[in-house]
Amino acid sequence: MANSQVLSTDQISFFKESGYLILENCIEPDLLATWQEQFWWCLNSSFDDPDSWPTDQTFIGRWRFTPPCPNISAVPMVQAAADQLSGGNFIGGGGAPIIKWPDSGGQWSLPRSSHIDGYGPPSQHPEGGLVLGATTNLHDVESKGGCFVYWPGSHLSTYDYLVRHPEQINGSFLDNEGWNYTEFSKGATEGPTEFHAPAGTVILWHGFMCHNGSPNVNTTPRIGIFGRWHYKKLEEMRYDILDDLWKHWGI
């Protein structure tokens, strides 16, 4: 499937306009069940036993599931979609689980702030070169359940900002006095939107799309699996997009 065209023309157009694309039933039930089993075995815990949840553990570094699908990028439909979008110019895709444990007595609201990946500490991200993300949940997630939150269309307003301030594409916008990511998200076509969906649904999102986490006031944990891709020729390509956002994509 990795070499097949799994995305339609309409899906690609939607992705380019909105900055994200939701793929339903993307992960086969058997694979999803295997991932769930491995995850909870690693935590020496059980989804069905809240007393066993290690709520102080919110991130598992260097995580890999058992082959042939050690991470989200190896899921056949995800791999094929990423290859189709990238035209072969992206690498990466691995990512660790990020856990939002329930706080049923907490207060819930959509986040007001956001960020884009790729401009954090070098140990975390290749600065300025992340272009595509993918997120799925190991279990069903409902609204207010610790959802991944995104600002539709903000990839274009982020890009517009960098076109107007090309010297800041290296991440120096973070040094601006009083910097706030609303400089990017204020041009979004919609406000912050929750990604809540059945387990095995995947959202693909552009690397310039503003996003954030959110509180979980439901009764079950949100186990998010993330993948991120960056340019193969990182140093060359990350600065070479100011004339065309899609210059090094396959679409």
Predicted features and spans:
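Non-heme Fe(II)/2-oxoglutarate
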Residues: 45-50, 163-164, 199-204, 208-251
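Active-site rim elements
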Residues: 65-71, 121-122, 182-193, 212-214
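Short edge-strand/loop segments of extracellular domains
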Residues: 100-102, 151-158, 228-234
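Short, structured patches in soluble enzyme cores that scaffold and shape functional sites
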Residues: 116-118, 136-140, 152
